[in-house]
Amino acid sequence: MEHLLHYVWKHKLFPLKVLQTTNGLPVEVIDPGLQNPNAGPDFFNAKLKIDGALWVGNIEIHTHSSDWFRHGHHSDKTYDSVILHVVSEADTEITRSNGEQIPQLLLTCPEKVQLHYHELCVADQYPACHPILASLPKLTIHSWLTALQTERLEQKAQLITQRLKHCNSNWEDAFFITLARNFGFGLNGDAFETWAGLLPFRAMDKHRNDLFQIEAFFYGLAGLLEETFLKREQEDEYSLRLCKEFRYLQRKFEIGQGMDATLWRFLRLRPENFPHIRLAQLAYLYQKGDKLFSRLLEAETLADVRTLLDARTSPYWENHYLFGRPSSQKEKTMGERSKDLIIINTVVPFLYTYGLHKTDERMCERAGRFLEELKAESNHIIRSWSDAGLPVVSAADSQALIQLQKEYCDKRKCLYCRFGYEYLKHT
């Protein structure tokens, strides 16, 4: 019930009758204040009139008055700034740390709001607010999706900043590790990130002009050249040469063992997405030129970015998906849709993060422009919103809706969602 009271207070969904304190003094809410997501009073800098006198301060909200004492606020000076205690049941008087009494307001949640909130909580169909989506004003939809898109980019920027710290502020290394993770396309994302974290970048830089040696580094540290794993597939001349080369590189650069190859997942994967193929494409990207991220910073169009991400394989993989198992001849290039997913999940967040770190608004704007120009992703989340009547055109739209599901819908945070707000107040 308390979270509903927060909602009612924030949006001033008060009953038509005059508000009064529990002592009968009239209350006029001029400004409910700014909601506080952290520790401390629930709303900051509210502006009220109590019995005609202007008060400016903080608001605390509880279901019962006695929760004030149960939470220890009566002895916490942080809460001495509270000017009004809002409750749904007033079962006791409350005081500040100096014993001074604090006014209380008995506030009930409107029945209509309670009913609609219950509907959202028990809805089987996703999204729960689907009955009203098609009728929402375009401005409401656009403004919320724009905010969600920024929220998602900010969230990704925080993760990239953490990775950057682990990489000693080396943007190229951090970019490649993130690129590798997203080459897993979901199912093998964790495995690719584990693998990329083992890569000795400075050692590999010394052999960047030799694709075979880069492949030896890559497959060796991926655990795919281990004898037990190779025998599960089939050894052939190429895999044995790679294995021999990796052992040499291990000794030369004092490199540790590769990862556990059982972390790689193959079940229900299309052969084009097998780890062997994606590793070969990453090796091609790594070998064809250094400072990939720096070159992406100079790419002003999506066409330029796609060219830089043109990933192929060495000749061996044109007729193999696994070691020692020949297949029909087929060039293993990365499809345009896969490239676009890499741009959405790797390039765009890095451009945005770089712009934030360097105070380069141009980079942040370019990141947003790329999302607007790219087509929307196609997955079950996006299809659900589209089926509910929400227009999904660009990757900016789809990224916003993914953020909406993961951070609001899945967590049942309808009270913090603008679509949820529209649902609760509809007639």
At which residue positions do the language-model features occur?
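Compact, glycine/acidic-enriched structural inserts
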Residues: 82, 86-144
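Hydrophobic, aromatic-lined core segments that form the binding pocket/scaffold
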Residues: 148-400, 413
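N-terminal ordered "arm"
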Residues: 7-66, 79
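N-terminal accessory interaction module
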Residues: 44, 54-55, 60, 66-94, ...
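Short loop/turn segments at secondary-structure transitions that flank enzyme active sites
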Residues: 65-67, 90-92, 111-113, 185, ...
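Cysteine-cluster motifs in flexible loop/terminal segments that predominantly coordinate metals
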Residues: 399-427
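Short alpha-helical segments and helix-capping/turn motifs at coil-helix boundaries
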Residues: 30-32, 41-46, 66-71, 89-92, ...
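N-terminal "leader" segments that precede or initiate the main folded domain
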Residues: 1-6
